[in-house]
Amino acid sequence: MDNKLEKMKELVEELNQYAYEYYVLDNPSISDKEYDLKYDELVILEKKTEVTLPYSPTQRVGDKILGEFSKYTHKGRLWSLDKAQNMEQLIEWHNRNLKVIEQYNSMSEDKLPELRYIVTKKFDGLTVNCTYDENGILIKSATRGTGIIGEDITAQIKTIKTVPLKIKNNHIIEVHGEAIMTKTAFEEYNKAAQVPLKNLRNGAAGALRNLDIKETARRNLSAFFYDVGYNEGSEFKNYREMMNFIRNMGLPQDKYIKECTNMEEVEKEIEYIESIREELDYDIDGAVIVVDDIKTREILGYTIKFPKWAIAYKFEAKEITTRLLDVEWNVGRSGRVTPTALLEPVELGGVTVKRATLNNMDDIKRKNVKLGAKVLVRRSNDVIPEIMGVAEESLEESKEIQAPDRCPYCNSHLVQNGVHYYCENTLSCKPQMVKSIVHFASREAMNIAGFSEKTAEQLFEKLDIKSIADLYKIKKEELLTLEKFKDKKSQNLINAIQNSKNCDLASFIYALGIPNVGKKTANDLVMKFKTLESIKNTTIEQLVEVPDVGEIVAKSIYDFFEDEKIISNIEELLNLGVKPYYEEERIDENPFMDKTIVVTGSLNNYSRGEIKDKLQSLGAKVSSSVSKNTDYVLVGEKPGSKYEKAIELGVKVINEEEFSNKIK
């Protein structure tokens, strides 16, 4: 038995190496026939021993249908990227980076290096996260999902022959990549498919979101990896070092990786990538530009959605012509009435387009858009398509688009304000009230569990809810009269509404629906002004001092709290028991408060993310590099060069046991 197991291990190692040479390096060292003979020998041994190694190439064969997708919590967050539509926006991003670095260097002896960027292609596929354990074995693969929680697609990823099932690494890591379908694989699949695929991206996404693993395998996906999102091993100094690590682990990586020292070089590389776009065997939709130095990334930081040290440059979208059939007028949460174009269905960028934005009547007139005309439609950055203009020859049989004078929902007279039309019937205009209630109850706002748009519609139509404050007056017996509301569901909603009364101030500010104020801005307002009363009474001059708040947003906030109806509504909420609170985090006195600490090596009781959170909760600043300004270096097993640097500089070194004793 032992001899057979040893032979199996030998065959698995050989076959995985041959697969890497064939699929990743495109440089096979043996013939297909030799490979097949070794593969068949492995299959026979696995049947005889009833043992299959977790990284055996036989595990790539899709021969099962899964019941459902389970959730997976990523160890490290998968961030989205901010987008630049043109070089002006890209240069603005670059200038913001320069400003932060200059400010940091002027205040710190530990200077940041000159700004360098790495430019890569932006693949148009599906983002995936692969987790390898301390033995180097692929143990989990997942979709991006929310960035924090994704769906387990381990079985699907194992069908991708370029993704190694085992790597030579002895620490837990998560690597991020893009699963793609090549044009070659797309054409081969469609030759035999009963229902042909429409585009490469849907081909890849559909394969990974398919519970039939055989179907996933048939699509013959590929992948490129470009980021280490979680790492319990030695830290990287820069992105080039990270990319070298990814390549040395045998993970497939695109060969195009360019280092740039200025924006002229970045622009040149973007132009080059766009010039070869059509020649590639896979789809790309732009370029990704990231800061090379890891410490600089830490200083630049993050927004709620994006890292500030990376940006995607999106290529100009493709355009297509179709016919405008009609215009639909919709009412938003603010009462603004906006036109939406109803189009003759057409394929654009892999999506069937039936609707497009028209913005407002001024936009319609400026573009000379008319009913029945052929219009030029552009779809860009996964947002709703936009009408860019009309085909002049189609205007002869077209009709003018008439601006509405009454609300399409409540029939109230509309009021024009600038280029927009508004319905001022805030109390009985259904879409306004319903959308306001849904926003107020949403998870990031008051977090009223079990609340849906259908519920909001019933509250408006059946219970005559005319303001947000009315939510807190609802009685259980009233809910029981609504469709699908039994005793338990009614009581749960009553409980959720009551529980929402104690909410943090930032969530309450966001819930109010102030124009142009998202959750991040709400958080920033609370951090700056501390109380609801202070925010209500602030001036435009004070508001523009808040990070990322310009004059337009400042005026929106100021005007919002000048509205007597809004102030009255807020006061009613407070009188009904809503108690928004703000608590500044209090940190007890401890040896690490206000100290700069560097962590190196593996700790027994903390992952890298956990120790960082723990130190920050103690009021410490966690740094990625050792300098004379470092107060402590916390050392675990197998420390890296940071330990040597600490000894060299005379920085105090402590182990995990000493750390634990100090915080008891």
Swiss-Prot record:
GO MF, one annotated term: DNA binding
Name the cofactor(s) required for activity, per the record: Mg(2+); Mn(2+)
- Any one Pfam family here would be HHH_2
Q: Which domain of life is it from?
A: Bacteria
The reactions it catalyses are:
NAD(+) + (deoxyribonucleotide)n-3'-hydroxyl + 5'-phospho-(deoxyribonucleotide)m = (deoxyribonucleotide)n+m + AMP + beta-nicotinamide D-nucleotide
* E.C. code: 6.5.1.2
Q: Where is the BRCT domain?
A: 587-664
Residues holding Zn(2+): C407, C410, C423, C429
The UniProt entry's GO CC annotations, sorted and at most eight, read:
cytosol
State the family named in the UniProt similarity comment for this chain: Belongs to the NAD-dependent DNA ligase family. LigA subfamily.
Protein role: DNA ligase that catalyzes the formation of phosphodiester linkages between 5'-phosphoryl and 3'-hydroxyl groups in double-stranded DNA using NAD as a coenzyme and as the energy source for the reaction. It is essential for DNA replication and repair of damaged DNA.
User: What protein does this entry describe?
Assistant: DNA ligase
Q: What is the native source organism of this protein?
A: Clostridium botulinum (strain Loch Maree / Type A3)
